[in-house]
Amino acid sequence: MTSFATILTQHGETLHNHDHSHILEPGRMMLTDAGAERVTNYCSDHTRTVPVGGKFEGRQKDVYNIVLACHDKALEITRPGITYMSVHLEVCKVLVQGLKDLGLMKGDVEEAVAAGAHALFLPHGLGHMMGLDVHDMENLGEVYVGYDGQPKSTEFGRKSLRLGRKLEPGFVLTIEPGVYFIPELMDLWRGQNKFTEFINYEKLFTYKD
């Protein structure tokens, strides 16, 4: 059986989108977030994004490669003894550099991440614990499960990281970076002149499609 309700959508800009009312259209990207549950009740959680029709069009491959670089960076540095918060932040630096290369962000990479400017494109955390539940033991409280009793950040984006604690041998966790273009959030931040020193809104708004 599935470990959670499958997310299958060409509207990946809507997080946890369970609306299946649309027909897949050529030229769009399809996001699949799905998992299976074993007879022993252990869960899996896999997220993939592929082009409808099998071929990238226009700028899709550029954005896909940024996400891939973020994923590979996380695999490279994730190990026991470091915090998952530090992994998350290093991945965010890769994200910002990739977006700078596309002309969507600007300025100093570390300053942009420290300020939280990257959260326009990644408004959630890198991953979470996984086990008998997809978000393992989350009902006990994220502060206890994901942060070992330490307080969570209240910053937009970073506060949605479900796992920030020091990693230990035997932990099972997900690595789920992404790049999102959320029209409503883009409009809001631009209207507030938010992080104009880091975000190239003029170029960004050409990605609204």
PLM features per residue range, with description:
Residues 1-209:
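Active-site neighborhoods and metal-handling regions in enzymes and metal-associated proteins
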